[in-house]
């Protein structure tokens, strides 16, 4: 009785007439137990079986069965047969890069068309393209926040807002007057009147002393007339200017004469008025500050 071996199924269907000579040869009957073993036929069967495995592996397409890649059945394959690998995309070999765009929907492109992934622009470029769409309010807030930084820089322009400080030119252009607040010459001065008269006296003496020192310096320069650096150093070494201000009661008058009449500014009348009203007002008992409810009251002594 002729025995028929079952052919092992492969991924692809093998034509029927290709291996019929292997299974349906006249000598393919079962040998009797008493007959000697046929080594030549066994070797031929092993060779054909190996060739059949090679043909089956060549017909096997790994790309169609990627789910079973790396299984334990790979150990059964012949080591001499070269394996075919799927090409690795350049994006995987190049390391971390821009994120890949999602694939387009099925209805947008053709059935067999491979979607091409265009490289996305860097994040800085994307932010730069969206910057013009920001509202004007954010730009205004950014400018306001940048003002303290620009003010801290040494090269930043100074503020043009008017300040309460007086420049030296403004101080020299005023006429000086002592306070007229005391009602009579024997009345004691208040601290405010005393401070005001002190500033006026110092300003008058300073004006006259500066004028005398300037005139003395002009005379010394005209007498020596230096022409070189050595002459200037010699003049500086011997220069000694002593200023004596002895105007007496005409101190304020002589000081006011030194002021240019084109830029003269009278003393603020409000200052004198405040001093006069403070001297004429009767002394009032100062009021104690209001106490809070949580502060304990001091016991009466």
Curated annotation (Swiss-Prot):
The keyword Phosphoprotein applies. One of its GO terms (biological process) is symbiont-mediated suppression of host innate immune response. Residues 174-267 are annotated as: Interaction with gE. This is Tegument protein VP22. Residues 113-124, 269-281 have a biased composition (Low complexity). Its main location: virion. Highly phosphorylated in the host cell. Packaging is selective for underphosphorylated forms. It comes from Human herpesvirus 1 (strain 17) (HHV-1). The keyword Phosphoprotein applies. Changing residue 141 to C: In strain: Nonneuroinvasive mutant HF10.
């Amino acid at each position: 009785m002729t025995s028929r071996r079952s052919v092992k199924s492969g991924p692809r269907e093998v034509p029927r007439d290709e291996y019929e000579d292997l299974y349906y040869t006249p000598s393919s009957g079962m040998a009797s137990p008493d007959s000697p073993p046929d080594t030549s036929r066994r070797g031929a069967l092993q060779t054909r079986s190996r060739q059949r495995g090679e043909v089956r592996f060549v017909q096997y397409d790994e790309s169609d069965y990627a789910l079973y890649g790396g299984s334990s059945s790979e150990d059964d394959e012949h080591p001499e047969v070269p394996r075919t690998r799927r090409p690795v995309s350049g994006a995987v070999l190049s390391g971390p890069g821009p994120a890949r765009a999602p694939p387009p929907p099925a209805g947008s492109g053709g059935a067999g068309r491979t979607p091409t992934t265009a490289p996305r622009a860097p994040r800085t470029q994307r932010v730069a393209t969206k910057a013009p769409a920001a509202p004007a309010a954010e730009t205004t807030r950014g400018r306001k926040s940048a003002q303290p930084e620009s003010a801290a820089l040494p090269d930043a322009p100074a503020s043009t807002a008017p300040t309460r400080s007086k420049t030296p030119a403004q101080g020299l252009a005023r006429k000086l007057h002592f306070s007229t607040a005391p009602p009579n010459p024997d009345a004691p001065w208040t601290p405010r009147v005393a401070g005001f008269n002190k500033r006026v006296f110092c300003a008058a003496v300073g004006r006259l002393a500066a004028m005398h020192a300037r005139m003395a310096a002009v005379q010394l320069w005209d007498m020596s007339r230096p022409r070189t650096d050595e002459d200037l150093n010699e003049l500086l070494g011997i220069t000694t200017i002593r200023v004596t201000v002895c105007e007496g009661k005409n101190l304020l008058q002589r000081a006011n004469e030194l002021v240019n009449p084109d830029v003269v500014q009278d003393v603020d009348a409000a200052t004198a008025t405040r001093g006069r009203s403070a001297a004429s007002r009767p002394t009032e008992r100062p009021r104690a500050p209001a106490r809070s409810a949580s502060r304990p009251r001091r016991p009466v002594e």
